[in-house]
Amino acid sequence: MFYIGSFWRDSKADFDENAPEPDTRAMESHSGIYLAASLAVVSLFPLLHYQLQSRALDSLQTASAIPKIDHFGSWQRHSVNQEIWKPIIHQPDLELTDTYTSNQGSIQLDIGYFHKQRDGSEAVSSNNRLVDPYGGDWKIVSSSVVETSKFPVLETTIGRAERKLLVWQWYRMGDLQTYSPYKAKFYEAYMRIFSGRTDGAFITLSTPLDEDRKAARKKLLSFYNQAIDDLNRQLYDLGK
């Protein structure tokens, strides 16, 4: 064992002694090239950011408002808005609040639409929320994820005094939808890279929680199933 250890130790020493001297000039040259390339790439980020911001600010949406849809299947739009609550949506390019009724009850639709998402005006933001946590009248009671035929949504119960609402919320980024803000950010990057689209939306449906949760959820699902395809087409056209 001593012999074997000595053999490897001697062999390594011989290898080190016989190894060619490193070409420090070549290494310095390559290091300089890599450093210059890295600095060039890094320097492009502010320029890219500036261009994206400039394009966002210079590109005005063709629509001055989100078009109103008079009915989704059996759900008819009220000519007079009857809102009792609104989500907090920070600096959307366009905003819509409408109330729809059927023999099942009433549903409020809210959309905050961002034609060109940019710093301070984007669908996924801590400024966009269902209630004001700092002294607002409405409070979040509970939240859970609910499956639909298209994609899961975030279901939240909010309350004020003796009144409660059941709210469904999700994001639309380009033509991709999710309730998750993390996945929505990924979708935003994906749409920017592969389709050049920068539009996004913060969407909620709400209904009074006067009876049991199952009945209120059934109303939301009925409206959702009859409205989602038309809403998607509407927002897709706005994002062109």
State where each predicted segment sits.
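Membrane-interface transmembrane-helix boundary segments in multi-pass integral membrane proteins
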Residues: 1-4
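Membrane-interfacial, low-structure loops and terminal tails that flank and connect transmembrane helices
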Residues: 7-31
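Internal/C-terminal transmembrane anchor helices
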Residues: 23-53
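Generic detector of ordered secondary-structure context
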Residues: 40, 67-68, 92, 195
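Alpha-helical transmembrane signal-anchor/signal-peptide segments
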Residues: 52-72
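Residues embedded in well-ordered secondary-structure elements
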Residues: 64, 87-89, 145, 192
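A cross-kingdom signal targeting lumenal/periplasmic-facing segments of multi-pass membrane
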Residues: 96-239
